[in-house]
A protein has these predicted regions:
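ATP-dependent small-molecule kinase catalytic core of the GHMP/sugar-kinase superfamily
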Residues: 1-123, 136-174
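Conserved glycine-rich beta-strand-loop-beta hairpin in the small C-terminal domain of fold type I
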Residues: 131-133
Length: 174
């Protein structure tokens, strides 16, 4: 039912059930709730996975990306062809929508390029259809060093915003 409201609703419902587990004790299938998932289809297929312990810096370049435009472009690309079946691999960072957005939104492409050039993240991946980009770290020392370097970084554009967080939790600060 949630997908009829919006493609991201099924994941949001699952994630919020996880985050509010104490208040929702006793509900059937709450055990399936997770703060992390592999999402496919148009967002209606949500397979819960255990969250990986990452330190994360989220970046937003201060522009809007049309989710509708990105999905329509992907739909046109796939029209008449079937998606290759991929085995879910939770060790791999991948976003089917990233190529279109990076190709058509120079600001996002510039952001990703600069993050990869100047920071020491293990992985850099766009979130959803964009424009937010996440830099993932397995080591807190590298994460903290990059966070500190960001405070005076000349490569950061004035319109960009960033937030520091940890995966699987609500420890958000900026």
């Amino acid at each position: 039912m949630g997908v009829k409201v919006g493609a991201d609703v099924p994941f949001s419902i699952m994630m919020n059930a996880c985050l509010n587990a104490d208040e929702l004790k006793g509900l059937p299938q709450l055990v399936e709730a997770s703060c992390a998932a592999i999402v496919s289809g148009i967002g209606e297929v949500v397979d819960a996975v255990m969250p990986r312990p990452y330190f994360v810096i989220l970046f937003n370049p201060g522009i809007a990306v049309s989710t509708k435009e990105v999905y329509e472009a992907i739909d046109r690309k796939l029209e008449g062809a079937e998606l290759a079946q991929r085995e879910a691999d939770v060790n791999r960072f991948y976003n089917e929508l990233e190529l279109y957005t990076l190709t058509n939104y120079r600001e996002v492409q510039n952001l990703v390029s600069r993050i990869r050039e100047h920071l020491h993240a293990d992985e850099v991946l766009m979130s959803g259809s964009g424009p937010t980009v996440a830099a993932y770290y397995t080591e807190e020392t590298r994460f903290e060093a990059d966070c500190e370097a960001l405070e005076s970084a000349r490569w950061v554009e004035p319109t960009w915003r960033y937030w520091k967080t940890k995966s699987g939790g609500l420890n958000l600060w900026s």
